[in-house]
Structures are given as C-alpha cells and as structure tokens.
Amino acid sequence: MAITLTLQTAEMQEGLLAVKVKEEEEEHSCGPESGLSRNNPHTREIFRRRFRQFCYQESPGPREALQRLQELCHQWLRPEMHTKEQILELLVLEQFLTILPEELQAWVRQHRPVSGEEAVTVLEDLERELDDPGEQVLSHAHEQEEFVKEKATPGAAQESSNDQFQTLEEQLGYNLREVCPVQEIDGKAGTWNVELAPKREISQEVKSLIQVLGKQNGNITQIPEYGDTCDREGRLEKQRVSSSVERPYICSECGKSFTQNSILIEHQRTHTGEKPYECDECGRAFSQRSGLFQHQRLHTGEKRYQCSVCGKAFSQNAGLFHHLRIHTGEKPYQCNQCNKSFSRRSVLIKHQRIHTGERPYECEECGKNFIYHCNLIQHRKVHPVAESS
C-alpha cells in the first residue's frame, strides 16, 4: 500500500539526512558562526544533532567540553530569538519524538514539525491514511486547489496536492519506476509492482537501497534478480494482513469504519460540512488541522520540499512528486479515446473535454463557452472595458 511505502521511505530519508548533516557539518566546521541559515527546521535539526551527538573526547578537557556544549545548545535553542515558552516547546517536541517508535520517529522528522502540536497532527494524518487512504488527502487537495485558484495571479504555477506519496527518486538519483514501477490504482500510487519492471540488471547499490525500505514489515516486494518473477501469492497475502487491522468505529452515515474514534469524528465532518479550524490570516476554514497547517504555508511562503535535480522548492511533498515527472518523463494518465498520456490527472480531465465537447467556462458578456479557463481570460480582452464614472 502507498502508506506502507511512505513509512519506509521516511526511514530511508532519515538515514540520508544523517549523511547530509555530517556533510554540512564538515563543510561549515570553521566555527559556530557558520554559513548555515539558522531560521529553518532543517538547520535546527542539524544544530540539535550537533548538541546531542557531541562527545567528551572531542575536547581537550572538561572545561572546554562544557563550553562547547553551551555553544551548541545556544546554536540550537537560540535564546536571543526564542521565548522561554518556545524553548520549552522545542525540548518537549524533541522528547516526544524520542519516545516514538523508530519508524514513526523517522516519519515525523521527515515532516520537520516545529511544535508538538504539529508532530501530533502528522501522526494523526498517518493513522487517518491507514484507515481510509486517499479520502482525507483528496479533501485537503480540493480545499487547497480552490484557495489557490482564488488567490493566484495569471500564469502562477499550481501545486497539486491530491497525492501524499513522496518519491525516492530525487534522493537516489535513479528512476525507481523504471526498476520497479508503482502500481496505480484509481489514479493513486499503490505498491511497488515488480511484474511491471523490465527484465534487466539492477545495480547492487540501488537494490540495497530499496531493500532497506522493506526491512520494517516486508510490505515492499523483494527486488528480483535478473529474470526473476514476482511471487504474486505472497504479495496478496501481505496485502491481506495489512488490511486486517481492527476498525471498531463505524460511521452511521456511510458505513466506513476506523481504528480510532477521533478519526471517525473528523470523518463525520465530511457529512456535516463542519470546518472548525480557521486561518488567522484570511479566515478560510478547514475540517482538519492538517489542512490548516498545509494552507498556512501559502501565507508564510515556506517551501520544505526541494527538487535535487533543478532546485525548485514546493510547500507540499505532493507538489514535488508531480514536478519530478518533468525530469523522469513519466506520464501515467492516459486518455482512453486517443491514447495520449499526461503527467497529471487534472490535465487529462481537461484534455478529455476535447472529446466530450464540454465547455464549462462561459463569458458573462456574450455567452460564448470555452474548454479552458485560460481561453476565457484571453477572450475577455475582445470586450471593451467599461470606464468607471
């Protein structure tokens, strides 16, 4: 399942982060006032690791060791910038992450939460996806898409958030879909499907990296040797086991079941329309806290997810996931009328209007209809603008 792959992806990225931390420490080891930007979650994680991993043997004596620890703690907690409450929040957050199971800790750290509340929301989202993959994510996607449409200027890039799958390709520098493609189910990423893989040799480096992902619970299919075939029965059995989690909380409206009552309560808001989480900046409301957190990045401009190929950054990992298809050339969405393929499902839906004749965009001045919104914008220029009196 997609969420299983993402959990194990988090562990892999945690290991990659450790390597990156070491590289950046070596690069900026000239002193405490390094070239690192100290105002982002990734840098705070680097300083935290420096503080926690400092060894007594690295200093010539006890006084120097204590002084170095004080410097490292200062770099991490930044008392000249943070209030006592903020410092306490960082310490509680660190301890909260420490007590989590290893695989969950890696998953949460991947999202770089800045508070305990945000870390809890990440975990609740994970539980929700295990309960009902896709539904809540698509709900967030719809809310974000509507907001972006309202606020975006003409020509602004749109970030799709209809998928929570984070690819490893930008970390490994390797087209994993060519080695072991992802099975798409109803337009959503599913499990690695080795049966779709070409019969060619896979490098030992890539093979070992992918196999690391499967060591937690084995839900990722074993990477085959050259010419091997997938054990279909074994894969189906693993899928049956993963779907056998008890879900005692049942929605009286639609019959869907959930593992926790809190997730059922949030689900019921899709029926009632309740949106208790409101943005302080623009007043927009959301049914879930995670939707509000994602939305707030539009105001702050925070973009945590960066493409290692071209450097472009995104506020959500789904935006990076779709962007990577530009580099890989992947076009998984195919028109059943003309067989033309597209990298995004939304583009396929717009393309299909050519075949169906649907023209949803109407000019209020003359009543002419258009397939694409951009065509309507262009058409409006033919109408004279009424001068204000």
Curated annotation (Swiss-Prot):
Keywords: DNA-binding, Metal-binding, Nucleus, Repeat, Transcription, Transcription regulation, Zinc, Zinc-finger
Zinc finger (C2H2-type): 249-271, 277-299, 305-327, 333-355, 361-383
Cited Gene3D superfamilies: Classic Zinc Finger, DNA breaking-rejoining enzymes
PROSITE patterns noted in UniProt: SCAN_BOX, ZINC_FINGER_C2H2_1, ZINC_FINGER_C2H2_2
Any single biological process term in GO: regulation of transcription by RNA polymerase II
PANTHER family associated with the record: ZINC FINGER AND SCAN DOMAIN-CONTAINING (PTHR23226), ZINC FINGER AND SCAN DOMAIN-CONTAINING PROTEIN 23 (PTHR23226:SF76)
Protein name: Zinc finger and SCAN domain-containing protein 23
Gene (name only): ZSCAN23
